Amino acid sequence: MQVYSLQELAQQIGATIRGNADVVVESIAPLDKATEKQLTFISNPKFRSLLAQSHAGILVVSEADVAFCAEQSNLLIVKDPYVAYAVLAQYMDSTPKAASGIAASAVVSASAVIGKNVSIGANAVIEDGVTLGDHVVIGANCFVGKNSKIGAYTQLWANVSVYHEVEIGQHCLIQSGAVIGSDGFGYANDRGRWIKIPQVGQVIIGNHVEIGACTCIDRGALDPTVIEDNVIIDNLCQIAHNVHIGTGTAVAGGVIMAGSLTVGRYCLIGGASVINGHMEICDKVTITGMGMVMRPITEPGVYSSGIPLQTNKEWRKTAALTLGIDAMNKRLKALEKKFEKK
């Protein structure tokens, strides 16, 4: 079991030390469960009451938290404990690492360009013209279609499908079951008969992008679908053809984006939101969970829609009132006209 000293961890995050610099921990745990062999952190002041009784070997805290800690606690004091936790979690990450090399059962085209220290798992298929950068990891049963490019240090977990002509940048992480570059939902209707429109655009994904499990990103009809740098997309999202998502935007689970939508930079899209296509959302917009966006958003800010959870009895009353709004409006207008005549 690898161990990490207070001094070593402090160097990773530029922390101020209080306590025994030689104390060591093995892993990270929640504040209320951490043992003397574990590190923990606090990022919300409402949990300060737990600090004095914590058994953690190391506590990551802000300057404002120090007074609430036991005198004997070993502290890493930082400006932002949550960011420090994220950095340390990466440093101490125990997720299994794939060994470089190509599994015997993998099928790799002779025309594929394979970088240094690449790992290709069992039963993976790498088609003609594919380029894999250095240190790329392709998990078991993955498919990478013709002429696609995957940048250095990008990892595809098992069972990811990357269609043809897709470009994925460096340091990306794509979780199992994701599909990148499938056909967009493009059809023409000829007197009741649907005629499929071939989707010949690409998907272009920037650097440091993460895509969750079972998320689907469709290829463009003509122009590409684009995901810019540092975008994070959660599980079970649908990104339709020709969507363009700006740098630094975060998309929570279950979001549906219709075709030709442009989402600005540094937006936060809450879970299960549904967003209409052929329109734009400006930079720095937050859409709360289950938002239904039918019109463009031109001003930064927080936007919500829908009715928050109520008891069934309350909801039925609300629904009944909503259905009666038109009739009430007509009665109000009639009363206004009546009083105007007087």
From Swiss-Prot:
Biological process annotations from GO: lipid A biosynthetic process
The protein's Enzyme Commission number: 2.3.1.191
Family of the protein in this entry: Belongs to the transferase hexapeptide repeat family. LpxD subfamily.
Function comment: Catalyzes the N-acylation of UDP-3-O-acylglucosamine using 3-hydroxyacyl-ACP as the acyl donor. Is involved in the biosynthesis of lipid A, a phosphorylated glycolipid that anchors the lipopolysaccharide to the outer membrane of the cell.
Species the sequence originates in: Pasteurella multocida (strain Pm70)
CDD domains found in the cross-reference section: LbH_LpxD (cd03352)
Keywords from the UniProt entry: Acyltransferase, Lipid A biosynthesis, Lipid biosynthesis, Lipid metabolism, Repeat, Transferase
Quaternary assembly: Homotrimer.
Annotated metabolic or biological route of this protein: Bacterial outer membrane biogenesis; LPS lipid A biosynthesis
Active site: H241 (proton acceptor)
Database matches in HAMAP family: LpxD
Protein name per its UniProtKB record: UDP-3-O-acylglucosamine N-acyltransferase
Catalytic reaction annotation: a UDP-3-O-[(3R)-3-hydroxyacyl]-alpha-D-glucosamine + a (3R)-hydroxyacyl-[ACP] = a UDP-2-N,3-O-bis[(3R)-3-hydroxyacyl]-alpha-D-glucosamine + holo-[ACP] + H(+)
GO molecular function terms noted in the UniProt entry: N-acyltransferase activity
InterPro entries: Hexapep (IPR001451), Hexapep_transf_CS (IPR018357), LpxD (IPR007691), Trimer_LpxA-like_sf (IPR011004), UDP_GlcNAc_AcTrfase_non-rep (IPR020573)
NCBIfam families: lipid_A_lpxD (TIGR01853), PRK00892.1 (NF002060)
PROSITE patterns xrefs: HEXAPEP_TRANSFERASES
Lineage summary: Bacteria, Pseudomonadati, Pseudomonadota, Gammaproteobacteria, Pasteurellales
GO CC annotation: membrane
